[in-house]
């Protein structure tokens, strides 16, 4: 693998980046994203392809998940961050995108993790994600959702 410096290739950097990405996704909450159409007086001036929420999440998380899959701490933190973001979102479709990425993190983490304790920790985090998603269904974002990640 390549990096600008060896310090950028460690799991701690990945986990710190995940914190910031999670904060950014919570900041977006259920805000609309630009549609790429720029008009004036009803006349189309410019159309630019833009990403939707799913594309944004894929861009943010795919490489970290792919390169971090051999580090249980990265997979655990990824699922924890997705759980925290899930608790922010009203939009069930956006939560489904997060669920896909939580499932990928769980599956890939389990595939590359041999220590039983780490495998159990990954499973526990995934179960917490599922509980947070189930709890969010039918609730507005103003209602509290309990997200725990003590260990």
Residue ranges and their predicted role:
Residues 1-151:
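Short basic (Lys/Arg) and small-residue
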């Amino acid at each position: 693998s390549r990096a600008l410096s060896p310090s950028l290739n460690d799991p701690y950097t990945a986990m710190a980046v995940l914190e910031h990405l999670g904060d950014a996704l919570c900041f977006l909450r259920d805000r609309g994203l630009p549609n790429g159409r720029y008009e004036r007086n009803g006349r189309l001036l410019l159309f630019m392809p833009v990403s939707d929420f799913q594309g944004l999440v894929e861009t943010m998380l795919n490489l970290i998940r792919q390169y971090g899959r051999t580090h249980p701490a990265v997979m655990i933190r990824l699922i924890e961050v997705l759980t925290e973001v899930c608790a922010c979102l009203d939009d069930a479709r956006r939560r489904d995108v997060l669920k896909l990425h939580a499932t990928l993190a769980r599956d890939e983490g389990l595939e590359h993790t041999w220590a039983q304790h780490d495998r159990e920790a990954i499973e526990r985090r995934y179960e917490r994600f599922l509980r947070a998603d189930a709890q969010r269904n039918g609730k507005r974002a103003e209602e509290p959702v309990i997200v725990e990640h003590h260990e």
